């Protein structure tokens, strides 16, 4: 078993097919297929299910992936320890939820100060970003927090006011039972706050419609499709234009914190240390 075999296994697991993995790694497909078969023979167990749509991990394959991710992360960190220079450089893989109002300022400031760092940004929901940080797929991520996890350390980024957004100027709480809720998929912090509020009020929403893009949610509200709950900064432009109306909600549910997370046991590169310093410089509380 060679390090290259583990890299091939990880790529096939992530991409879901031999052809996509071969393209990502710049290998011929037959080489990838052979390496996977050799790995399965060596471990005496099938690691993938083969089907028309590609390949998915078996239970043993999922177990294998946990170890492979850790091994390859350790190898990367070993390289970083010896190659890390005083001047931040290299690749920094960062995840983020879609509504971090301070993110453009943080990224712009960081890039101007450390132009040799290649920032890779990936959008996602809080729960999936936590998982990807734990799996070493991301160096860190901006999520809705705070959270408690023994393997994660977190840094305050911002606190914002949450607003209920509707098409109509007037709103009554009973409308939750007659109007669809427009939300992100499960794993979104704003959705969790909204669902907790409704549960405490004993209200059952008429319908929940899930979206992947914030602007689609807000534009749908503006067209009268439903109502949503988002940070005030995310809807300010539409509210100012009179296309939607914002309503305060009970204080218990009315704010959301954004935190930056990373694995506690990850090697602290100069690039990451400088990124955390930049976050600290731009930390703010926006509750106006």
From Swiss-Prot:
Statement: the UniProt record of this protein carries the keyword Transcription regulation: yes
In this entry, the residue ranges of the DNA-binding region are 18-37
Question: What are the entry keywords?
Answer: DNA-binding, Transcription, Transcription regulation
Molecular function (GO) terms listed?
DNA-binding transcription factor activity; transcription cis-regulatory region binding
Record domain HTH lysR-type: where? 1-58
> Keyword Transcription regulation on this protein?
yes
Query: Could you tell me the superkingdom of the organism this chain comes from?
Result: Bacteria
Family recorded in the similarity comment: Belongs to the LysR transcriptional regulatory family.
Q: Quote the protein name from its UniProt record.
A: HTH-type transcriptional regulator CzcR
Species annotation = Bacillus thuringiensis subsp. konkukian (strain 97-27)
